[in-house]
Every structure is written in C-alpha cells, then in structure tokens.
Design a protein with these regions (language model features):
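Core catalytic alpha/beta fold that binds nucleotide/phospho-ligands
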Residues: 1-198
Length: 198
C-alpha cells in the first residue's frame, strides 16, 4: 500500500520469506547484510530495501554512525520501520518518520515510560497506547538525534477524529521539542497500525 503525503510517500508491505528476498536482492543489498548474523535482522533489512527499490529504483543507501539509513547523493529523506511481519518506508522532501506495529504487542508493559496522563486521557480506545507508541517512534525518527526523551521532548496533544479502529484513519497533533508536528495514523488490517509524520 502507498500513502501519499504532502512531502512524499509512505509505503507498507508484508515481509516476504527469506528465500524470495535474497533471490530478488541486488548485489549491494546483499553486501549490506553480509555482516548481520541475526536471520530476522537480515530479513528486515532486505525487506525494507526491496520496498525502497519499488518506490525509487535508483535509490542508494548508506548508514550513519548510529545505524540510521540515509540516501546517497540525494536531498530526499528516508525513514524505515518493521515489525515481525511487516515493513514500512517513508521517502520525502523533508525529514520524516514512520512506525508500523502489530497490535498484539503488549504496549502497557512500558506505557509509563512514554504515555503521560494527559496523553492517556485523549482516547479511550484499547489500542490507544499502541497509537501513541507508534507516533512517538515516528517523531523520534524524524528528530534524527540521540538522547530524545519520549515523555519530556515529545507530547501528543490532539487526535481527530477520536481513534476508531472501525473507521481506520485519524490525524494526530504532537509537539516535538516544542514545535508542532502533524501525523497520520492508519489501521492497515486487523493486526497492524501505521503512523507517519505529515
């Protein structure tokens, strides 16, 4: 699926099996995973690289010292996300952030580290903690710096319409280091949500 944005586009896709990914990978993509010993990490990287290739066939990737991907010889910005069985890539003209998550993940275990009482009061939906986590992950990726505190440096201040997993789309307003940032949330299917900066 492709979601157009004012600054570019966000694509999301299921992660294919390892054999399909490796047989379809370019030599450069295979070199990029040569030192990765974890099979799941290799698959995740090959999956998002394949999705990026479908969005921008000539895109070349390099990695910053913190491991964040960057497009070589391009002014475009990239953000990537993956969960166990799904991958997302945001590609655009300005810094961006994207996060995809499975809804069966237990977000309540760590909610006290990222979900403030005022944020919790914004929505009563059972998946609201997942939405806030995704939004803050997307904001973190957009920020592109170390030492960001998910409570101090970013806040979700509004959601419209109220989160409704039947309707499947909503608009979020956040503050990142005091600056307003808009995000979109999307229910991909019964098991996944996607949030990206606008």
């Amino acid at each position: 699926m492709i979601y157009p944005t004012p600054w570019g586009q966000v694509a999301v896709a299921p992660i294919p099996d390892a054999e399909a990914l490796e047989s379809g990978a370019t030599d450069e993509e295979l070199r990029s995973v040569a030192g990765i010993t974890s099979p799941s990490r290799r698959i995740e990287r090959l999956a998002w690289r394949a999705l990026l290739r479908s969005m921008s066939p000539l895109a070349q990737v390099e990695y910053l010292p913190n491991g964040k991907p960057k497009l070589k010889n391009s002014d475009k910005h990239i953000s990537v996300s993956h969960c166990r069985d799904c991958v997302a890539v945001a590609l655009g003209e300005k810094p961006c952030g994207v996060d995809v998550e499975r809804l069966d993940r237990n977000f309540s275990r760590v909610a006290e580290r990222y979900l403030s009482p005022s944020e919790a009061a914004l929505a009563a939906d059972e998946h609201w903690a997942a939405v806030v986590w995704c939004a803050k992950e997307a904001l973190f990726k957009m920020a592109g710096r170390e030492g960001v505190d998910f409570m101090r440096d970013m806040q979700i201040v509004a959601v419209e319409p109220p989160v409704d997993f039947v309707q499947g789309r909503w608009h979020l307003v956040a503050r990142l280091f005091g600056e307003e940032v808009e995000l979109r949330g999307v229910v991909i299917d019964a098991e996944h949500i996607l949030v990206f900066t606008l």
